[in-house]
Amino acid sequence: MTIMRKTHPLMKMVNHAFIDLPTPANISGWWNFGSLLGLCLVIQIASGLFLAMHYTPDTMTAFSSVTHICRDVNYGWLIRYMHANGASLFFICLYLHIGRGIYYGSYSYLETWNIGIILLFLTMATVFMGYVLPWGQMSFWGATVITNLLSAIPYIGTDLVEWIWGGFSVDKATLNRFFAFHFILPFIIAAMAMVHLLFLHETGSNNPLGIPSDCDKIPFHPYYTTKDFLGIVLLLAFFFTMVXFFPDLLGDPDNYSPANPLNTPPHIKPEWYFLFAYAILRSIPNKLGGVIALVMSILVLALLPHIQTSKQRSLMFRPISQFLFWLLVADVLILTWIGGQPVEPPFIIIGQIASLLYFTIILALMPIAGIIENKMLKW
């Protein structure tokens, strides 16, 4: 008798994706972050659904509805902090996932990589709109500053901004539409994640050596289900420690003040996961130039498959490229720090140097290093 999971139409799909999937035998813990991102998305959708039951997207009551959730709803404080810190956890996993993709050359899978970049943009849009919903000071001013960047687009910019706002400033219409988009986007992200997986399973997973692994594959279950489960346990332990003991560690104190259009905070800044891009935006004195640099800071990832010069896929045996990769990681951390600092010397010049270095490493130094390494190996 044939096993049901191999014949039933629905079970067959699950079987091919998570049970009998041929997987390289040598993939490391760095390959766990895909499943962890799936877990983060489930946490966010579940906690967000319960928050939406009590939240009101109205400028007069949004802030007090969040207060009501924290004070009056059963375990409302827990759900709210799970949702807020879940976003941070999502981006920690996301950046580690992207870093692993760059290090081991996973960007060679073009469709999977490009859908990953679309997923990153969708996640950033979702998180930005979610940050506006509590209607605190930083919510309001963050929304005003970031949406206002679109006015830099020639000719249609001003009309575009007013169209997004639904008026002449960030107001009730803006909050309402942001809530609607924030609610629907995670489901679009979930659908895109399925497409991401679909394309990944067309080619099979990459591995640390960056070489074809068709000759040495093992079934996903039980080997990698067990490995993923360990990752999930460690992630949840870290997550709940954070939620229960340090819930406001990554938040902004300004967001505990209700939004006031008449009072500008001394330093407007986004959440920590956008600070590197915000620092790149601020490092260019021209508004349109800054917006282009901001978009390119993410979009530059799409160029990676086209500017790879090395004949080796992974960085595992490429010491010069390894050095440049870790220099890039350090540079992104410096940009993150600079993004949270006021616009004054010496932070301005540090931000400009770090921004220039960011694009130089990706677009020039890494391709040059690949050519040098090929020459060293007489390839």
UniProtKB/Swiss-Prot annotation:
Pfam family, one: Cytochrome_B
Cofactor details (free text): Binds 2 heme b groups non-covalently.
Transmembrane segment boundaries: 33-53, 77-98, 113-133, 178-198, 226-246, 288-308, 320-340, 347-367
SUPFAM superfamilies: a domain/subunit of cytochrome bc1 complex (Ubiquinol-cytochrome c reductase) (SSF81648), Transmembrane di-heme cytochromes (SSF81342)
Major subcellular site: mitochondrion
Bilayer topology: Multi-pass membrane protein
Gene Ontology CC annotation, any one: respiratory chain complex III
Description of how the protein assembles with itself and partners: The cytochrome bc1 complex contains 11 subunits: 3 respiratory subunits (MT-CYB, CYC1 and UQCRFS1), 2 core proteins (UQCRC1 and UQCRC2) and 6 low-molecular weight proteins (UQCRH/QCR6, UQCRB/QCR7, UQCRQ/QCR8, UQCR10/QCR9, UQCR11/QCR10 and a cleavage product of UQCRFS1). This cytochrome bc1 complex then forms a dimer.
Protein name: Cytochrome b
Gene behind this protein: MT-CYB
